[in-house]
Structure formats: structure tokens, C-alpha cells
Amino acid sequence: MSRNDLILKIENLQKLFPAERRVFGKVRLFVHAVDGVSYEIEKGESLALVGESGCGKTTTGKILVGLYEPTSGRVIIEGEDVTPYLFQHKSRAGQYLKEMYIDRFNAPDFDPSSLETEMDRKMYELYQSLGKNSSSFVDHLLRDRSKKMIELRRRVQMIFQDPYESLNPRMTIYDIVAEPLNIHNIGSIKEREERVAQILADVGLTPPDTFMFRFPHELSGGQRQRVAIARALILNPTFVVADEPTSMLDVSIRTGIMKLMMKLADEYDMSYLYITHDLAVARYMANKIAVMYLGKIIEMGDIEEVLHNPLHPYTKALLAAVPVPDPEYRRGEPDIKGSVAKPINPPPRCRFYDRCPLATEECAKIPHPQLKEVSSDHFVACHVVAGDAKPK
């Protein structure tokens, strides 16, 4: 597949939250919510981001839609570096451009032929065309920054976990779904009404006229989540972050919502980042998977390959927790020790070290492992599995 088919590329994404308040002096304690996360999603693909509560899944999704600022790293959507638009303050966006591009382009040993991506080459050409003037480069890229952020929101949307809290109780269903069209000034009043009616029909709220002027409290949980899906899709985004959209719904209607989302992905030609703690749901909704633990991705690849041949001890533990319908089947319990450690200033060693049944003395002395490809489209971050540390 061509690199032009990349919908999303995340490079070394990090998000730190201060874990203490100081009137004077520098904050020294940070929660490492997301720490060095990298992955790609190509056109037509959906990636399931799985892990326990607190591992950084939702924080990653909120960064992508601009609800959180990244601490460091780069977010590329459809070949465009959108990271500068994710920062609230222009000065922070300018600092990012300086560190990511200007300092690199001005390095004594910089070689333009070393630029691997089309986007990086375009950035360098722009820098050259502006006379290698750093201020002009930053001003050019940050011009109309708020407008570009609005354009980004048109391409990237989010479906939130709680359909009872994510819908304004004072707005009608029509107003909720039409609000993105109003913000982006799309269509006439009649065209908006037609578009809302169409999207409500697409998500299974039929006939649309019976839902348009009702309020959220008049709908069931499943109907509310269908409204949330309609709101996310009304602008025809290319990429949608779905944050456990079925976890708060009754079991009897979860499958219907998942089937609906898969159908809409085909009809609207879009990709999902599907956040979940349920591996069975992940398998149904995605064709790629990334397993997170304490802010790090520890295993990633084709979902069938990873689930049929898990290599990381944590992935094996997650699979062991999935219920098996056969009452006669007996599955061994995973040899996982203790509980999840606090993510405040974690040591540089492997995040899973304290609980890992494979951990050796070498694992304690070397930094957290990088993702290493162990087979076709199957990556794991484990010193022992990758052969960088001798097994016990």
C-alpha cells in the first residue's frame, strides 16, 4: 500500500500530567500517561487500542482530536503535520516547529537527502523558499491556526464512551446532530435538515422525523449512542476515535451498535481508532491491534496474528481473562504478579518488569524495550522474546 494511503501516523507521542502542585520551583513529579507511542493507520484499516484502565488509551485518543495537548511527539493526518494545531498557545506551537524542523534543518551535519517522507521534504522546501528565515517559517505555518484546527476537526471526530453525559440534555436531537454543520457553516437550513434526516436514517433512527425534535432523556442508551455516532459522522470524517462506545450499553444491544459501526465504516470510507479493554470486541471491530501497558505499546500487529500467537506475557494475560463459552475447557491462569504500578516518574526499565514472569536481571539494567518485528506485521516490546536478554 502506498504511503499516500496513510490516514494517521503517530511518532513518539508523549503526554505528561503534573502529579504535584508547586507555588515556587519546578514540578518534578509527572504522570506518564502516554510515553513514546508510535503507530500507523492506513486507509481502510481500523486499529484497536487495548489495555487495562489507566494505561493511556483514552488520553491518546483525546490528543488526536485536540482535547489534550501532547507533551512531545508528532501527529500526522493524511500527510499533514497537525501537531502545531493541537497546542492551545501559539508560543508552544512555535517551540514545537523549532525543535522538530528548524533545529534539524540548521544542524551542521544535516543532509536533505536523509529526509524520508514527502511531508518532511515539503517542510524543507518551504523553509528554503522563505530564505531559511525561522520567524517567517513559523509565522507561515501558524497563520490562521484556529481555522486550521477547525478544518482538522472536520476530518477527525470522536465517539465518547458515555452516551448519557456526551449529549447536551437541553438540546433536541436535531440540534445536537446539526451543530457541526452550523459551526462549519455547511449548507442552507433546508440542506442541513435533509442531511440530519439522512444521517439519522443511516444510524438506524427511523423514521427520522420521530426523533429529530425529541430530547436525549426520551431515548434509550442504545438510541443515544446512535445519536452520538450520527453527530460524529455528519461531517464525513476520514478518521474516527471511538472510545469504548459500547461499554456502557446493555449487552443485548452492543452487537447491534458494533455491526452498525462496521457498516458505516464501509459506507463512509473511514477508519477507526477503536479504544477498548475487551479483546473480543477488538477482534470484531479492527484488523490491527496495539496493546498498551502503563503508557507504552508492548505488542502490535495484525489482530489475528497477535491474538492467535501472543508473545508478550501481558497480552497472554489479557487473553486468559477472556471468557470461554465451553464449560469443559480449562485454561491455565497467567503467572502475573502483583498489581499495576503507579505511572508517576516510572524507572527507565521495562514497565512490566515487576509483574513479568520472564523478567531477568538484565531486564532491570537496560531501558524499556523498543518494539521489534518478530514476524511479518507482528511487533513486540520484550527483551526476552526479542532475544536481547537471556531467558531464565
Where are the regions a protein language model picked out?
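Conserved ABC ATPase signature
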Residues: 214-219, 223
